Amino acid sequence: MLVTGIVCPVALVFILLADRLALSTAALVAAAAIAGAFAPPVTVLTRTVWRYRFDDPAERKTAFALDAVLIELAFTLGPVLVAVLLAVASPRVAFTAALLLVALAVPVFALSPALKYWRHQPGVERRLLGPLADPRLLAVYAVTFLLMFALGLLEIGYAGFATAAAMPAFAGILIAINSIGSGTGGLLYGGAQLAMPVERQLPRLLLLVVLPLAAHTVTGSPWLLAALALVAGIGIAPALTVVMLLISANAPSRYATEAFTWSTTFLVGGLGAGHALGGRIVEGYGARAVFGVAAGAAAAAAISALAVRQRKLAPVDR
């Protein structure tokens, strides 16, 4: 954690000063790669702390739901802050603000009183593949990848739709509306008392994402699409909350941190893959095709979630 808190900000400083240091393109790419590779794993460690901190299932669900809502809030407010700084200042100022936030992340986390709940697992047997050797966790990771793949496609689809409608700024609005829907759904889910086991909730929550995504393919109205974006978001944060609950329940204590780390890997990997494929599809076939593939990916996630539902969950190791 300490290493990432130093290396990542330093790499970002090199990027910030690239022109003054006369860095080559290769050096700039290397600095960006290092910054990404050493990104502080604050979210991973936070979710691990939640696992240890909350024994009560209802409290743990609320914690993970709040985590999902805060992630949505960050993804919504971050671009807005950048846009404002770009409008009133310069790209350098916007990048500096991002750098400062990254630099503050590790100290703030390290000083958090929540760390007193952290548990070390000394002298335990570990396997090479760790959590990847557990079929229950692999099923959850597959759902995570497919859902985030769908969301990556969705973001590109919004950009393509807005560009085709000669309303390029509308893409950011659609993404923000979708995030608002997700945050609202996360808050509602966190406060709900549901008797249904979480593994059975997951396919149903994903279905709430699939249906409005499918409706994206048949509308050409920006305002109707905005309404569908809101509805499509409602199931996202609850679904991600359930994913984290399932990882928390299935991961042995010796692999708790690794399990959430791999979850983040599949999450980011799915999002990036969706962006990459979405860009190719939107150029050749348009936004509606991207929305269709996104709906298909979300449907695949819902079907994959049935395998998670049928497995008996292991208790959390203490």
Whereabouts are the PLM-identified features?
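C-terminal ends and interior cores of transmembrane alpha-helices
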Residues: V7-A22, L208-G220
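Cytoplasmic helix-loop-helix junction between adjacent transmembrane helices
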Residues: A33-L73
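Helix-loop boundary and gating motifs at the non-cytosolic
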Residues: P131-I175
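Helix-to-loop junctions at the C-terminal end of transmembrane segments
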Residues: L86, T184-V198, V282
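Intracellular juxtamembrane helix-capping segments at the cytosolic ends
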Residues: P40-F54, Y158, P238-A251
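Hydrophobic core of transmembrane alpha-helices in multi-pass small-molecule transporters
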Residues: S24-V42, F145, L225-P238
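C-terminal transmembrane helical hairpin of 12-TM major facilitator-type secondary transporters
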Residues: E199-V243
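A late C-terminal transmembrane helix in Major Facilitator Superfamily
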Residues: R254-Y285
